[in-house]
Amino acid sequence: MKILVDENMPYARDLFSRLGEVTAVPGRPIPVAQLADADALMVRSVTKVNESLLAGKPIKFVGTATAGTDHVDEAWLKQAGIGFSAAPGCNAIAVVEYVFSSLLMLAERDGFSLHDRTVGIVGVGNVGRRLQARLEALGIKTLLCDPPRADRGDEGDFRSLDELVQHADILTFHTPLFKDGPYKTLHLADEKLIRSLKPGAILINACRGAVVDNTALLTCLNEGQKLSVVLDVWEGEPELNVELLTKVDIGTPHIAGYTLEGKARGTTQVFEAYSKFIGHEQHVALDTLLPAPEFGRITLHGPLDQPTLKRLVHLVYDVRRDDAPLRKVAGIPGEFDKLRKNYLERREWSSLYVICDDASAASLLCKLGFNAVHHPAR
């Protein structure tokens, strides 16, 4: 049994070698010749999986180690009788922590408290729900917009997008990319929406590049609209609008979900799905794969305020470490993908062990996802 895996999927060689012969290949582009005798293909979002790639090939199963699936023609795979699995929620925590890192940086730079801001969350799936929970743990007001969930009658106080635009100080997008249909998200943030944002609003896109109309956004910024922008995803990746990059406050190369834990979850989820598909079901404990974190433990004295939270968050991950490298190489062919391929190890907040002498601080940090304990001061 021959299994092709994206060379940038961590732990893929070791895990899938339990099931067959593993060959690691680049994801963009996939070497088509390798597909001629392969039984399974494991990809990331950079690989377009469709009829033109797989027609006439012996592939029986495709797995994507990503939450999003807009790069995969699922309908064709089903028609062709090819098994498929994604990894929903694998990087949700990572994306939430990316958003927090960005917001805390902007809050420090611009001198505001997040408690004085209302956050509008567009898309309330794995990422949006977790983001809402952490913001509300901090006492920060949120507004939710998710028409598909609202129409299904899912639990939640869902509002219209117009209402979020009117009332939110921060608007953050966490939707799939739907190019048509009743829940179309292509250019959901169009020129009209962008112009309607509150003065000084923060716009964040960490889902799919085309959810925000990049040309319209650049037009508004060039005209002097007072707006802070955080973009992790771009229309036309791996190409991007270099002029737009110069105008945004934070720009990164589609790495919001790139924690070691998130990547490992993606790999293990598709590994478990494929092992079940071939009748050799196996389960993997994530902590058996991950290395020890860089920081062993730290001690926190007193209550948790925003500056202290910012220091803790940026100790684990400061988004500026990914903004600067992109600006240096933007527009150079191949460099966007190189930044992703050679991405520095990044951990999640749970890797940081925090000893607190304040019980409320320990409790709050645990709700936020840190590994925190309360030890009273002596």
Curated annotation (Swiss-Prot):
One of its GO terms (cellular component) is cytosol. Homodimer. It is an enzyme of class 1 (oxidoreductase). PANTHER family: FORMATE DEHYDROGENASE 1 (PTHR42938:SF9). NCBIfam families: PRK00257.1 (NF001309), PRK15438.1 (NF011966). Substrate binds at S45, T66, Y258. It is found in: Cytoplasm. It catalyses: 4-phospho-D-erythronate + NAD(+) = (R)-3-hydroxy-2-oxo-4-phosphooxybutanoate + NADH + H(+). Its main location: cytoplasm. Belongs to the D-isomer specific 2-hydroxyacid dehydrogenase family. PdxB subfamily. This is Erythronate-4-phosphate dehydrogenase. HAMAP family: PdxB. Keywords: Cytoplasm, NAD, Oxidoreductase, Pyridoxine biosynthesis. GO terms for biological process: 'de novo' pyridoxal 5'-phosphate biosynthetic process; pyridoxine biosynthetic process. Catalyzes the oxidation of erythronate-4-phosphate to 3-hydroxy-2-oxo-4-phosphonooxybutanoate. PROSITE patterns: D_2_HYDROXYACID_DH_1, D_2_HYDROXYACID_DH_3. Its EC number is 1.1.1.290. The keyword DNA-binding does not apply. The active site is at R208, E237, H254. InterPro entries: D-isomer_2_OHA_DH_cat_dom, D-isomer_DH_CS, D-isomer_DH_CS1, D-isomer_DH_NAD-bd, Erythronate-4-P_DHase, Erythronate-4-P_DHase_dimer, NAD(P)-bd_dom_sf, PdxB_dimer_sf. NAD(+) binds at D146, T175, D232, G257. It comes from Shigella boydii serotype 18 (strain CDC 3083-94 / BS512).
